[in-house]
Amino acid sequence: MSNHILAILSTPENELSGVVRDFKSFTSKAIVKAIHDENESRREWMLQRLVANATRAARNESYKVWTHDNHPLQMQPHFIMQRVNYIHQNPVRAGWVDEPRDYLCSSARDYQDEPGLLKVERVW
């Protein structure tokens, strides 16, 4: 999705916050670099937004890509399939694609034995 990420992650006990922190740090730098380096028509607008976000934050950052909060849910095995289906249907509900596997950034392709963009460990 263009303004949020839904993911199912598994980490060793008590390490999820560190994984999310490192993910946000790495991707923030990569996103800002891509905005600067690529021929992006909305470059100035996006950088202004990221600078404004950083100005409102208490941390000493030039740009702020991610919000400070997260919304983790601990999932039981019977709930995981429901959440995976919810995640896959998100771009369909938004009207971006007709089928979940048509959304390029979705793991839905992996669940239909088609190659996706990233390596995905299927949960069933």
What are the roles of these predicted feature ranges?
Residues 1-124:
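Short catalytic/metal-binding and nucleic-acid-binding patches
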